[in-house]
Amino acid sequence: MSGNRRASSILVPGMLVFRKEDLFFRSVAMTFHTYSSECPFKSIEDIKDKKITIMGLGLNGGGEAAARFFLSKGAYVTVTDMKTSEQLAPTLERLNNDDTLDHSRLTYHLGGHDLADFENADCVIKNPGVKFDGNKYLAASKAIETDLSIFLRFTDCPIIAVTGSKGKSSTVSAIYYGLLQAGFNAFLGGNITVSPLTFFDKVNSTTPVVIEFSSWQLADLRGRGVLKPHIAVITKIVPDHQNWYGNMQDYVADKRLIYADQTADDFSIFDAGQDEPGTGPDCGGTWGDLFAKETRAKVIRYNTKTQYSVDFDSLLVPGEHMKLNAQNAATVLQLMGVEKQRAKEILQTWPGIAHRLQFFHEWKGFKFYNDSAATVPEAAAAATQAFGRPVILLTGGTEKGLELDKLTEVLDGTNKEALAPKAIYLLAGSATDKILPALDKADVIYNGPYPSLDAMLGKLKSDLESADEEDTDIKPPVVFSPGATSFGMFNNEFDRGEKFMTAVKNLLR
């Protein structure tokens, strides 16, 4: 296992630089913020009585986990967030009602930030969704860490790290499920909404930890030299977060950090397939080819036959793309010592994960699937093809600077190789506004846009009742796959998915 070795590579603005005997590749002419490899704490015990500012409490558990962790280690903790106490009520209620916490060491500054909280702190714990550049609060901080950097600095677990644009959450879920079923005492954390600080005290040098990394979480590790995964997986790369990065080269530059400090004792798993037209590296070839040239680890390519390939007869989760995610999980399980046939048997019982084509309800023969984690158009387009027959699609929302062509071409029938939805229901939002002209031009019938889930589901119920009276055939799946962000109507994609499932169950009993 790789453990927490000293960094042997250096990351500097605008390029990924390995040792001189390794490949050199200039990624893009931009400035990336590089963090210090030094930590403000010499040890976990050194946290006691330090002043910690947690930048961002949030509703997904990351800020809450950091507050709990540092309080448990005897620190003085200040939690600050731009959101108000009313907006953060669920998280605050959990913290304030927990009698095991030392509330005399906990302070809240909500509804805005105070520069003094950053200037006076021994360490600031940063939210990954906050850019360093141009942020006066971070610029005033003596030291900046994240929940992931703290976990990686002070543990020596074998890390299985996964990033990518499509399929990373499903892949980590399948890996974690497989490890547990194979008898490993494994843990899962990261971008899948579980902070690794929640299980910090439960791991040791033999505990496999599966971590999903967003590009932002990886960017927050640049220069620290703490991420040395025994196994690194990069799932399919497609345009994402282009409203943040502005171009694919900068976006992928952060993804590439996942393997920057691997060694020849480690494994890298990359795509062998083609990138979508116009989305590959400026230097030519594919992203998978580039990754394979750069990493020092042993390379395994998926989307091609290898010694680790498994032929899945069936999976509980629908879609060919889910078979690819399961294949990556099968490869990881084999690298961890699980026999190939056993890996196949385990993964064929994998139930999938919440908010990813999650079957959750049946009403009058109609099966309902929650795919709220589909925040990019390509994911929603894939969901329409996952069942091998036309679906009733509930989609739309707020766009984030992405091309909508892949989804629009399915909806308006331009993609002749794809199954067009049997019916379309649209949530209001800027992404929906960009889809509508193509649908109108093609004379596609659609419902909406609706300003709320309740309005959309009310119309859907009426239509399904009418269809049930007229149609005795097998009912089409009803799939909620927005292909857009949740912001505006919901706190995040998980809040959106939970509210969708609750609304469906309440309305369709």
Regions found by a protein language model. Give the residues of each.
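Nucleotide phosphate-binding/pyrophosphate-handling subdomain across enzymes
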Residues: 35, 43-51, 69-73, 315-421
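Residue-level signal for inorganic ion chemistry
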Residues: 70, 124, 162, 191, ...
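C-terminal helical cap/extension that packs against the catalytic core
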Residues: 91-98, 404-477
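N-terminal amphipathic/hydrophobic targeting modules at extreme N-termini
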Residues: 8, 16-22
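Phosphate-binding loop of NTP-binding sites
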Residues: 45, 71, 116-121, 128-268, ...
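Short beta-strand "acidic-cap" motif of Rossmann-like dinucleotide-binding folds
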Residues: 77-81, 188, 301
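Short internal beta-strands
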Residues: 75-83, 268-272, 394-395, 420-429
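N-terminal leader/targeting and accessory segments in enzymes
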Residues: 30-146, 427
